[in-house]
């Protein structure tokens, strides 16, 4: 039984004061594993959120950890959120919307992030597209989907939210991906291999 389970069961537990930041994450990670549910961990700012993610990964490298960050602008600012911030937030929300089944997972966020409104779950599902090697999909269909969901077509992909198309090759820098992904089409079928452009490594 984890410490959090003991608290819910009314078991007498000792109180520990002045524990260093991150010590509580050991129990939170255990709780996520034991309950096979999504556990939300809220911290004060992005610096602590990043540190919490690193600590949780150290405690359980196989646990799925999602970072839900806040927008980096105010509602009435004249500038839009940066692509990096928008992509990370969208990736986390899309992962939660696509996989609602109970599972061991830790969501790390900030007080500012959870105070901001999110897109409806159905809208996030509709804006997501899963592609697999060998899948049949027309390039025009993929192109229309990317444009409809805010991707920018460019000659060479450099930032998240961009894609490039040259013949049967499509390079996409999607939210949540550490590197751009290359899709090779044979007719309307995706090739078996993906290429991470910056590393020039075929998987």
State what each model feature region is.
Residues 199-203:
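A short, hydrophobic C-terminal helix/tail in secreted or cell-surface proteins
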């Amino acid at each position: 039984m984890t410490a959090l389970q003991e608290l819910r069961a009314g078991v007498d537990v000792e109180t520990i004061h002045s524990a260093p930041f991150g010590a509580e994450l050991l129990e939170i990670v255990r709780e996520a594993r034991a309950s096979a549910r999504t556990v939300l961990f809220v911290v004060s700012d992005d610096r602590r959120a990043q540190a919490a993610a690193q600590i949780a990964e150290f405690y359980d490298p196989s646990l799925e950890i999602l970072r839900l960050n806040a927008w980096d602008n105010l509602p009435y600012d004249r500038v839009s959120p940066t692509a990096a911030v928008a992509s990370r937030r969208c990736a986390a929300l899309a992962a939660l919307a696509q996989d609602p089944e109970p599972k061991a997972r830790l969501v790390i966020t900030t007080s500012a992030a959870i105070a901001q409104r999110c897109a409806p779950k159905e809208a996030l599902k509709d804006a997501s597209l899963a592609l697999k090697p060998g899948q049949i999909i027309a390039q025009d269909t993929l192109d229309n989907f990317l444009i409809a969901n805010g991707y920018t077509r460019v000659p060479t992909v450099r930032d998240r939210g961009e894609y490039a198309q040259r013949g049967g090759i499509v390079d996409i820098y999607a939210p949540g991906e550490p590197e751009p992904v290359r899709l090779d089409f044979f007719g309307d079928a995706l090739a078996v291999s993906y290429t991470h452009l910056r590393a020039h490594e075929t998987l």
